[in-house]
Amino acid sequence: ITLSDSVNPNTLTGVHAHKNRVYYWTGTSQNFYYSATVDTFQGNFTKFPVGLVGTFGGNILSINSLSIDGGEGVDDLLAIIMTSGEVLIYSGSNPSSDFALVGTFRIAEPVNEKRGIAKLGGDVIVMTREGYLPLSQVVRQDLIGNKAQAISEKIRGTVISQVKLTGTSTGWQIFVSPDVDKVYFNYPTGDTNDPFNQH
């Protein structure tokens, strides 16, 4: 892998394939890298900066595909989640030609662990300091001026308290069962991890 800005590829910590194109990021900057060709994990990758797109800063924590039905059929979008809680959503399949910014959205600051973000069907669930949010609801509710409701709303106080206690610790993780029948939200309690369950 060769990156266009000469950053050491060994510093890359994240990878995601969207519409057959591979994206890498380091987790310590506001840039991601994309391949000029599809269906390859190697070769030359071009830097794409997003630092001037948002307003709240932060580094790229995760990149995911998000499917949303906008009324004219389902559209597969690229969601870039920043450590600040800002979410940048793009349509298109090639950053060099047809990328278009759908919008920037604000959620509570995510727990600082990539495993606290997971794909669930066409949606993306994010563990934040105020609850566990489905990004599809964030986008839909923002468009009509409402605040998205967390799927953890019934245990909101417990979640907020736990994040205050161990929010900077490792062990935050969303695990979706193989049959997609259950979702487990693991959180660190000190020496071990305990789950909240969603059926």
Where are these regions (language model features)?
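Acidic/polar residues in short coil/turn loops that connect beta-strands
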Residues: 1, 26-28, 84, 130
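A short alpha->loop->secondary-structure connector
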Residues: 1-5, 41-45, 96-102
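Asp-box/WD-like beta-propeller blade repeats and closely related beta-sheet repeat scaffolds
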Residues: 1-19, 50
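Surface loop/turn motifs at the tips and blade-to-blade linkers of beta-strand repeat domains
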Residues: 3-8, 53-56, 104-110, 165
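Eukaryotic intrinsically disordered and solvent-exposed regulatory patches
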Residues: 8-10, 49, 74, 111-112
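Carboxylate/His-rich catalytic cores and anion/metal-binding grooves
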Residues: 17-47
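Beta-sheet-dominated scaffold domains
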Residues: 17-20, 64-199
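Extracytoplasmic beta-rich repeat domains
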Residues: 54-66
